[in-house]
Regions:
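N-terminal active-site segment of His-dependent metallophosphoesterases
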Residues: 1-57, 73-74
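Active-site neighborhood of phospho(di)ester-bond hydrolases with catalytic His/Asp-centered motifs
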Residues: 4-6, 33-38, 62-68, 109, ...
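Active-site environment of divalent metal-dependent phosphoester hydrolases
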Residues: 11-13, 41-46, 68-76, 113-117, ...
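Charged helix-capping and loop-helix junction motifs
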Residues: 19, 47-51, 122-127, 160-169
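Extended active-site neighborhood of metal-dependent phosphoesterases/phosphodiesterases
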Residues: 49-128, 136, 173-175, 206, ...
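Short acidic, glycine-rich surface-loop motifs adjacent to enzyme active sites
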Residues: 138-155
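Conserved beta-sheet core of the metallophosphoesterase superfamily
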Residues: 159-234
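A short C-terminal boundary segment appended to hydrolase-like catalytic domains
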Residues: 232-253
Length: 253
């Protein structure tokens, strides 16, 4: 199974949540860790360093993608001309692939310097990921990681304004070649939606849009505690929430 973290927002982290995640990894057979963006609060060197140290402490293979908080906000020169310099100093490539016993994980950079919060998936990215999905082992679950969700329900205050430009086009193309799910953060609210049913994609299996809450930050939304997702090799998605009394992450009943 994989541990799906998001919106760590180092610079606003809670040590008790970090410790509880470390304990969880020690106690469970985690194949890999996914961190779906917003690793930092303000893209500072110290924040990237702290995030890197934390992910390394989990002692599991991991894959990360940038979020909108991972490029400079106030330093306009850096935002325009070198938005990912600090990110790449600690995490190298913006887009990676990680293969485990049961999963084939593809990272996609949906962050653009011209947008404050909204994502964007280019035609080149759509084609590249499509080729990767076609080449992926058929016996593994194929998951694509991007920071912004590809779907928000009609009553969501963010609406479609934060969903990536060309996200629907990407979804329709990737679902033709075995996509099982998309992993996101951004909204700080855990959820899972079957896009095969919502959009009538015609896939032979569910295509999940899986949202993670914030795992370690005090920047909580909707009065929800810190949380993360666990996804097993049957594509069963479980949400775990931080219990302030037990100081552990516990599965939602």
């Amino acid at each position: 199974m994989i541990l799906h973290l998001s919106d760590l927002h180092f610079g606003t982290e809670k040590p008790e949540c970090m410790w509880a995640i470390q304990q969880f990894c020690q106690q469970h057979q985690i194949e890999a860790v996914v961190a779906s963006g917003d690793l930092t609060q303000r893209a500072r060197y110290a924040q990237f360093f702290a995030c890197k140290q934390f992910l390394e402490s989990l002692k599991r293979p991991y894959i990360v993608v940038p979020g909108n908080h991972d490029i400079p906000l106030y330093h306009l020169w850096n935002r325009v001309f070198s938005p990912f310099t600090r990110y790449k100093l600690f995490f190298d490539n913006l887009e990676n692939v990680l293969e485990t016993e049961h999963f084939y994980l593809v990272g996609v950079n949906s962050i653009r310097r011209r947008y404050h919060t909204r994502g964007h998936i280019s035609l080149e990215q759509i084609q590249r990921v499509d080729e990767q999905l076609k080449a992926a082992p058929k016996n593994k679950l194929k998951l694509v990681i991007a920071h912004q969700p590809f779907y928000t329900p009609p009553n969501d205050p963010h609406g479609v304004k934060d969903c990536p430009v060309q996200g629907r086009l990407a979804l329709e193309q990737w679902s033709k070649h075995g996509l099982n799910g998309l992993l996101h953060g951004h909204l700080h609210v855990p959820a899972a939606y079957d896009l095969n049913q919502i959009y009538q994609l015609g896939a032979a299996h569910p295509v999940w849009d899986i949202h993670a809450g914030t795992a370690t930050s005090y920047r909580l939304h909707d009065n929800l505690p810190n949380s993360f997702n666990v996804i097993d090799h049957h594509m069963d998605v479980r949400h775990y929430f931080f219990n302030a009394v037990s100081q552990q992450f516990e599965q939602k009943p």
